Design a protein with these regions (language model features):
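Short hydrophobic core segments
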Residues: 15-17, 44, 145-158, 277-278, ...
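Short FAD-binding loop at a beta-strand-to-alpha-helix junction that anchors the flavin cofactor
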Residues: 210, 216, 272-290
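Flavin-binding catalytic cores
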Residues: 228-258, 275-278, 300-324
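N-terminal Rossmann-like FAD-binding beta1-loop-alpha1 element of flavoenzymes
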Residues: 2-42
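C-terminal helical "tail/cap" subdomain of flavin- and related membrane-associated enzymes
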Residues: 303-404
């Protein structure tokens, strides 16, 4: 095949708006997929310095990916509490993993730097608009216009409205946490607490999430599934109350603070708004709506999409993105989110029942969008089946609309 000529008027072959998880993962994936030697990647990010010190990605290690070396902690047991009840589960060969943002950034940027002038990062520049043309795309930024053959848009979408219009479920997973260090050994290092619902439910679905890094140090987060964000004082008070109850007498030093907001929505995503623009990351639908997990979804997408982009660069064409998830998993997420909206008071019991009754390997796959049809049926059978069945009927219009 004859390589298309390099267009000297182009600033890059692939322009990526945003150098976060999805943008950096795709850039690395393009190199790994055999991007032509004369092709260039340009990442455009509004930050003056790229840093992931304020974020963490966690996941069940079910999918091989390029960032295994960035994993700092693995937990072979995971714990859920609801009132006086608690369950600890594990599955052979499956760990719950943590990648700190700074480790991910360091590894990704090191890999991109090794590519030399083929990869460039523009700092302190905001992408404002992307416009497809016949053989190129214009990327309008705060400092001028850039031209490329393809553009990937990882800019975060606007948070969905919390208004209930009867068409979509719009919840938010929002959290605030602290990395804490105690002078005494107070944390069980081999077990991650994914959900402790034995906390106030005054503001909606609420749990504490705990990742122990060692016996003295842990990330403790207050997490809500609700329609609106809350004042910082609510999260902080929840953490303080949990520490007083679960670790009485311990003295803690705050090492760092992190917070975040993840949309849990049934609103449809448009990952391919124009022939030469593809949305990636949250904007592309690469966050599982019912759980908020994103890391593996992004890596799966990169694995499937990067070869398509490489082929498009060689042929001079466009690259159609693969679906973010299957119609089956989309339908299940829609039903489950509708259930959480209709029955928020039942959420602690439902989540606890899932961890208690569903085989842990099956549940890990389900939460990570790696489940088989048999896995999904098992989860539905072991959950709040009558209420979920009713919610499936209520959510049928949403499911049909998303399947179009």
């Amino acid at each position: 095949m004859i390589e298309p000529p390099v267009n000297p008027a182009l600033d890059a072959d692939v322009i990526i708006a945003g150098a976060g998880l999805s943008g950096l993962s795709l850039a690395v994936g393009l190199l790994d997929a055999g991007m032509p030697d004369d092709a260039r990647i340009l990442l455009v990010d509004p930050r003056e310095t790229l840093s992931g010190a304020d974020r963490t990605w966690c996941f069940f290690d079910l999918v091989p990916h390029a960032f295994e070396a960035a994993i700092t902690h693995r937990w072979n047991h995971w714990h859920v509490r609801n009132g006086a009840d608690e369950v600890v589960r594990s599955a052979p060969g499956i760990s719950y993993c943590r990648i700190p943002g700074e480790r991910f950034y360091d590894l990704a940027l090191e890999r991109l730097a090794a590519a030399g002038p083929r990869v460039e990062i523009m700092h302190g520049v905001t992408v404002e608009n992307l416009v497809s043309h016949g053989d190129h795309v214009e990327v309008h930024t705060s400092t001028g216009m850039l031209r490329g053959r393809l553009a990937m848009d990882s800019r975060p979408p606007l948070l969905p409205s919390a208004a209930d219009d009867g068409k979509d479920v719009n919840l938010l997973q929002h959290f605030r946490g602290r990395v804490l260090r105690s002078t005494e050994p107070v944390f069980e290092t081999g077990t991650a607490t994914l959900m402790d619902f034995d906390v106030s439910q005054e503001h909606g679905i609420h749990f504490i999430y705990v990742l122990p890094f060692d016996a003295h140090t842990a990330l403790v987060e207050s997490t809500f599934f609700t329609g609106r964000l809350l004042p910082d004082a609510v999260y902080e008070s929840a953490i303080e109350n949990w520490l007083a109850r679960r670790r009485p007498g311990a003295v803690f030093e705050t090492i760092s603070v992190e917070s975040g907001v993840i949309p849990m929505t049934t609103e449809p995503f448009d990952p391919w708004p124009s022939p030469r623009v593809v949305r990636i990351g949250t904007a592309g639908g690469h966050v599982k709506p019912s759980s908020g997990y994103a890391f593996l979804a992004v890596q799966r997408f990169v694995r499937d999409f990067a070869p398509r982009v490489v082929s498009a660069l060689r042929a001079g064409g466009t690259a159609e993105p693969p679906p973010a998830r299957s119609p089956r998993t989309t339908a299940l997420d829609t039903i489950f989110l509708s259930y959480l909206r209709s029955c928020p008071d039942r959420a602690p019991d439902t989540f606890y029942r899932l961890f208690e009754r569903v085989p842990p390997a099956v549940l890990a796959r389900f939460l990570s969008d790696e489940g088989t049809l048999a896995d999904d049926l098992t989860v539905m059978r072991k959950s709040d089946s009558p209420r979920l069945a009713l919610e499936a009927v209520r959510a049928a219009p949403l499911v049909r609309r998303k399947a179009r």
